[in-house]
Amino acid sequence: MKLTDHTLVLSDQLFDVDTLVVDDAQIREVWLRRKATGQLYAGVRCIDEFCSFGIWSLPKGPYVCLEPWAGRCDDEGFCEDISQKPGINQAEPGECWKKQYAILIG
């Protein structure tokens, strides 16, 4: 999914198919706003860069999940060596690998 205007309008049908996945580290921060007032009420700020961002809900669910992803599932039809998988991360033996994000409630 490509973002062009930095806005995604949520609807009851938006998650009928599946999770929305935004790749290529396009997202650093996501906020949910109240439709009626425009007031911010929750968000996620990526402190480190994440390769992908998942946005999902059960169809007609009373919530929206905002998830920074440091990796993700295979693309449909991917049959290559795991080292060729997009978004793959590797830590050397003894190395510590961390990513940080903040959950913001307002």
Residue ranges: model-predicted function:
Residues 89-106:
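Short Pro-Gly-centered flexible turn/kink motifs
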Residues 33-74, 79:
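Glycine-rich active-site loops that engage anionic ligands at enzyme catalytic sites
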Residues 2, 35, 60, 85, ...:
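Context-gated lysine
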Residues 81-88:
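Short alpha-helix capping/helix-loop boundary micro-motifs
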Residues 1-47:
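Active-site/ligand-binding surface loops and adjacent short beta/alpha elements
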Residues 23, 46, 57, 90-92:
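Sterically constrained small-residue positions within well-ordered secondary structures
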